[in-house]
Amino acid sequence: MLDNPSENKEVILLPDGRIDLIYSQSAKEPFQAVLLGIGTHPEQIVIAEKTKIFAVSFNLLATEYILHQSVSKLLNSAQVLPTDFWDFNVDDLNDFEKFCEKISIKIQQELTQKIDERKLKLFDLMYSSKGNLTVKELSEKVVWSERQINRYFNQQFGISLKSYCGILRFRASFQHIKEGKLFPEQNFTDQSHFIKEIKKLSGFLPKELNQNKNDRFIQFSVLPEK
């Protein structure tokens, strides 16, 4: 949930490997539902004053088994959904706990199809390893050819498996960077490789992300302190 009661706020969204379902309303914009695809580069946005946003973040398998659609055309893009998508309306933004209850029930209702075991294992390995397994290793563990996996990824998500694993490694570094650990803790070959990959996906150096001036990196701002 994000509630911006004051003036317009500029923020930067960083790639995190998730698909986001956004319900929002502001003083100038009516209630709307938007589906955000995978991001591969930072995006600067302005959150208008008096804006309330409720967001639901999904892992990739949800696109096929809960949202029932390909998001390949939504790479670095968004789709405006019908305003009554999943039977939500502006009144649902008044109570976050009730919103969470309602969305949880809806997700369970949409999950009607048995999940392919190979896909389930593939994503379990990807997320548990935080993107640190190679495409070859994943292919061998799942017993699914690299070519078929990449075809599935490109058709369903608009991105290769290798590129997506890079985003997962990047996302896994958020907490370390926020804590001031500006050195590689994921599967980066060395410090220069770490800095290069972080800058490629964020547009900034690790130390700039750590400083997070004016809370502009919204995902860093909501990370818990340790």
Predicted regions: what they are:
Residues 1-120, 127-130, 134-136, 142-146, ...:
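Alpha-helical bundle regulatory/interaction domains
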Residues 114, 153-177, 197-201, 205-216:
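Alpha-helical DNA-contacting segments of helix-turn-helix folds
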Residues 149:
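Nucleotide/phosphate-binding loop and acidic/charged catalytic motifs
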